Amino acid sequence: MRGNPEVIDYLNMLIGGELAARDQYLIHSRMYEDWGLTKY
């Protein structure tokens, strides 16, 4: 990918945080489902 290396590093840091948030969301949803909690 071409571009300013500082911008690319910053974007990589941001996407890392977004992926971590997604993983945490999925882990919690499975944990709640295992506990028998439902959305309804």
From Swiss-Prot:
Role summary: May perform analogous functions in iron detoxification and storage to that of animal ferritins. Contains approximately 750 iron atoms per molecule.
Which residues are involved in binding Fe cation? 18
Per UniProt, subunit arrangement is: Oligomer consisting of two types of subunits: light chain and heavy chain.
Q: One biological-process term from Gene Ontology? A: intracellular iron ion homeostasis
Spell out the protein name for this chain: Bacterioferritin heavy chain
* Highest taxon listed in the record's lineage: Eukaryota
The alphabetical list of record keywords is: Iron, Iron storage, Metal-binding
Which InterPro entries does the record match to this protein?
Answer: Bacterioferritin, Ferritin-like, Ferritin-like_diiron, Ferritin-like_SF
What PROSITE patterns does this protein's entry cite?
Answer: FERRITIN_LIKE
- Family assignment from sequence similarity: Belongs to the bacterioferritin family.
Record-level Gene Ontology MF annotations: ferric iron binding
Could you tell me which residue ranges the Ferritin-like diiron domain spans? 1-40
